[in-house]
């Protein structure tokens, strides 16, 4: 259980349809069932 704060906040997957946060090992969204998940961005995008 040596999980850093950064790992806990950033190691997630985000649904492309409803933007729900999902665990990293998820195959589909927990809210809407959509299969297209992306990993949460770990760096801010520049303008």
From Swiss-Prot:
One cellular-component annotation, GO: ribonucleoprotein complex
One GO BP annotation of this record: translation
GO molecular function: structural constituent of ribosome
Keyword Membrane attached: no
InterPro entries given in the database record: Ribosomal_eL40_arc (IPR023657), Ribosomal_eL40_dom (IPR001975), Ribosomal_eL40_sf (IPR038587), Ribosomal_zn-bd (IPR011332)
Signal peptide region: none
One matching Pfam family: Ribosomal_L40e
Keywords: Ribonucleoprotein, Ribosomal protein
Ribonucleoprotein listed as a keyword: yes
HAMAP family per the UniProt record, alphabetical: Ribosomal_eL40
Family: Belongs to the eukaryotic ribosomal protein eL40 family.
Protein name: Large ribosomal subunit protein eL40
Native organism taxonomy: Archaea, Methanobacteriati, Methanobacteriota, Stenosarchaea group, Halobacteria
């Amino acid at each position: 259980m040596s999980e850093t704060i950064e790992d806990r906040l950033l190691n997630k997957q985000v649904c492309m349809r409803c933007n729900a946060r999902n665990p990293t090992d998820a195959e589909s969204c927990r809210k809407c069932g959509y299969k297209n998940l992306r990993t949460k961005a770990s760096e801010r995008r520049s303008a």
